[in-house]
């Protein structure tokens, strides 16, 4: 290995050490005039023209990155800058102001140990290496530049100057400046607030080749402000972060790179909620803040003031800020509002204070109420939690007669939280309130949920209260509009079922009363009536036989035609009983007469001619009378309407096809044209039905009378 290579390796090792020392000493606030145990570096404090102090602890931690020999690979060096929260108590809460000045609750004391502010990545990228040299003459100059230690040193000097400047411009430097100013006024801060500054800035070295965990702390990738939750910028970096890269320096063994990712919003502050009545030494400063706030509220005509026992807002007197003005520690006064998105109190339950008029301040923890944007809901809930009671401002009462109003009661579906704070302050201003119990505070899950609601800038709760009523009204109107249609349908069906009743009675041998129909559709019985079936069998058989004989003889002599007995389905009866085959279907059959020449076989019946002529006249009159009132299918001589039969009159087929059966059933008929369906069974059944006549007349004509209405 040549001397130039050894010098380059030494510069690379010093690069890692100097960068770590510079970043740590720029971020850590000096305590007592210097760092504990500081020692000068062996190579001096002015390496790369940047002054740094020696730190043996850091040098021991960074040893794996300062022992590069030119052969082994070096893992990336990660240096994190974080805000240490381990000094917070359980009654202290950390908040963050966004760019618009809205407070966002970060965590309560004891919940998280730290908040990561910056993450620096220092590495030697071995992907680019010029150890093999160059064979092209045009690249000799570039190759020599990479292998020149003096040139590399100059580039590193410029890099560290830029690095130091960058550390002074990052947002975390603002916190460091404020902490330094607050430590200079520690005595004054202790007198004013009764507590020391609990926040500190620290750094940590990590191995970049290992995963970085964020358990128990607020990691860099976690957005605190909800508006940054689901947005990404063009560089695929979370919108609450920004990234800066320093131009890499190429060497013979690789490229030296420095990259930083940091939070844009770092305006953190702490609210102490332990003893609100103890902080009374600086009441005049508080009143000045209230007066300035009153002026701000009065100048805005869109802001209304309202104070309610169930909705109280506090002006917290004890903000422990991370900033200060001048040489002293100035307390941060802020007005935060508490909203209740899940519960609305009664209109007349609270005291009314006129807008723009705040004339009395009763204690160091007064209550101001105003309309605020939805982005302050989360922080306002936490501010509400820290008060033992809220003062109802009343312009008509003097400050010494004012009393603390009843405390807020915050309840929601996410948990049971009851607050009891009804304190009368008429006895003494210096009276100490009891510390609040930790279990009376709202859970962080509820506050995190409220943060999710901040995606919408404006929440209008009025439409949501009207929507259910509109849905009910729309449903009722729609239901009422269906009633006339239902009545019309019922009337039309009733008329269609009863229009053919008189005509059917003229052509029927039934003596049953006129059937009546109801517009209400009754349920279809599941079983046939056994009593109706048994009582009607005897009379049905006798009546059908006599009627069949007379009609068959009269029509046979009159037309002289061969009648083809066919069975057509006019309607279909549907029942709901699937257990019995007897009540599955009830068909109404029609007749079709086919014209044609047939043999006249009535010559053997000369003795009945006179009687047949009378029957022919009666039959023709019945047919003419029936066809005058209703239209029938072109393919049928008669059409018998199903609607003319009542429930007890609908005939059903017997399983043996010997005797017709009638039973009571409710059915809805579907009317259509009759179709011709030949039925051989009825032809065969006609032999049994007409056994008393001659053999040559038995096969001529058969009236299917199963669709006629016969009474018991």
Swiss-Prot record:
UniProt remark on domains: The minimum ATG1-binding domain (residues 441 to 500) comprises two alpha-helices and a linker connecting them.
Location of the protein in the cell: Cytoplasm; Preautophagosomal structure
Entry protein name: Autophagy-related protein 13
Subunit structure: Hypophosphorylated form interacts with ATG1 to form the ATG1-ATG13 kinase complex. The ATG1-ATG13 complex interacts with the ATG17-ATG29-ATG31 complex through direct interaction with ATG17. Interacts with VAC8.
Consequence of gene disruption: Impairs ATG17 localization to the preautophagosomal structure. Still forms preautophagosomal structures (PAS) in proximity to the vacuolar membrane.
Amino acid composition bias (Basic and acidic residues), ranges on this chain: 424-439
Gene3D superfamilies according to UniProt: 6.10.140.1900, HORMA domain
Organism: Kluyveromyces marxianus (strain DMKU3-1042 / BCC 29191 / NBRC 104275)
Region (ATG1-binding) residue spans: 441-500
């Amino acid at each position: 290995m040549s001397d130039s290579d050894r010098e380059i390796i030494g510069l690379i090792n010093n690069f890692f050490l100097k960068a770590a020392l510079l970043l740590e000493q720029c971020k850590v606030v000096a305590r007592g005039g210097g760092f504990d145990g500081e020692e000068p570096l062996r190579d001096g404090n002015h390496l790369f023209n940047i002054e740094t102090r020696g730190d043996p602890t850091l040098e021991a931690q960074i040893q794996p990155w300062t022992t590069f020999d030119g052969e082994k690979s070096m893992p990336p060096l990660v240096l994190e800058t974080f805000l240490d929260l381990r000094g917070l108590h359980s009654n202290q809460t950390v908040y963050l102001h966004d760019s618009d000045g809205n407070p966002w609750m970060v965590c309560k004391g004891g919940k998280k140990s730290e908040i990561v502010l910056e993450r620096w990545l220092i590495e030697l990228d071995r992907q680019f290496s010029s150890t093999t040299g160059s064979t092209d003459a045009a690249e000799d100059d570039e190759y020599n530049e990479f292998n020149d230690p003096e040139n590399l040193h100059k580039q590193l000097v410029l890099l560290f100057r830029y690095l130091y400047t960058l550390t002074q411009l990052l947002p975390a430097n603002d916190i460091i400046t404020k902490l330094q100013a607050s430590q200079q006024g520690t005595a004054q801060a202790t007198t004013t607030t009764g507590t020391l500054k609990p926040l500190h800035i620290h750094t940590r070295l990590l191995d970049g080749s290992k995963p970085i965990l964020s358990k128990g702390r607020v990691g860099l990738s976690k957005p605190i402000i909800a508006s940054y939750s689901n947005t990404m910028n063009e560089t695929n970096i979370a919108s609450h972060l920004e990234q800066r890269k320093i131009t890499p320096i190429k060497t013979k063994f690789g490229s030296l790179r420095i990259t930083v990712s940091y939070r844009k919003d770092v305006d953190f502050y702490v609210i102490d909620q332990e003893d609100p009545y103890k902080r009374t030494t600086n009441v005049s400063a508080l009143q000045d803040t209230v007066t300035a706030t009153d002026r701000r509220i009065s100048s805005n005509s869109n802001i209304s003031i309202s104070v309610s026992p169930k909705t109280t807002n506090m002006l917290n007197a004890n903000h422990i800020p991370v900033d200060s003005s001048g040489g002293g520690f100035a307390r941060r006064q802020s007005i935060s509002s508490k909203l209740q998105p899940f519960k609305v109190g009664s209109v007349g339950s609270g005291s009314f204070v006129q807008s723009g008029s705040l004339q009395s301040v009763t204690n160091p923890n007064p209550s101001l109420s105003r309309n605020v944007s939805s982005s302050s809901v989360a922080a306002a809930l936490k501010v509400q939690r820290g008060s033992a009671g809220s003062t109802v401002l009343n312009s008509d009462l003097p400050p010494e007669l004012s009393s603390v109003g009843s405390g807020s009661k915050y309840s929601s579906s996410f948990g049971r939280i009851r607050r009891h704070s009804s304190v009368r302050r008429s006895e003494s201003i210096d009276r100490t309130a009891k510390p609040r119990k930790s279990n009376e505070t709202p859970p962080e899950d509820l506050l995190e949920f409220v943060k999710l609601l901040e995606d919408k800038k404006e929440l209008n709760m009025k439409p949501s209260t009207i929507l259910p009523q509109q849905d009910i009204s729309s449903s009722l109107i729609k239901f009422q509009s269906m009633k006339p249609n239902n009545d019309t349908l019922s009337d039309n069906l009733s008329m269609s079922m009863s229009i053919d009743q008189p005509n059917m009675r003229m052509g029927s041998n039934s003596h049953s009363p006129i059937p009546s129909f109801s517009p209400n559709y009754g349920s279809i019985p599941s079983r046939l009536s056994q009593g109706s079936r048994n009582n009607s069998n005897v009379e049905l058989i006798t009546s059908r036989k006599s009627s069949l004989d007379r009609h068959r003889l009269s029509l046979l002599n009159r037309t002289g035609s061969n009648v083809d007995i066919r069975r057509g389905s006019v309607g279909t009866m549907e029942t709901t009983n699937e257990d019995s085959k007897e009540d599955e279907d009830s068909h109404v059959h029609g007749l079709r007469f086919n014209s044609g020449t047939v043999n006249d076989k009535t010559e053997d019946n000369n003795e009945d001619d006179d009687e047949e002529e009378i029957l022919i006249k009666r039959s023709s009159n019945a047919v003419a009378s029936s066809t005058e009132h209703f239209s029938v299918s072109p393919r049928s001589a008669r059409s018998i309407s199903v609607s003319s039969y009542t429930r007890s009159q609908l005939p059903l087929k017997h399983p043996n096809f010997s005797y017709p059966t009638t039973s009571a059933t409710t059915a809805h008929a579907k009317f259509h044209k009759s179709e011709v369906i030949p039925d051989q069974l009825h032809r065969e059944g006609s032999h049994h039905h007409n056994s008393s006549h001659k053999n040559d007349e038995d096969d001529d004509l058969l009236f299917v009378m199963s669709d006629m209405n016969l009474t018991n």
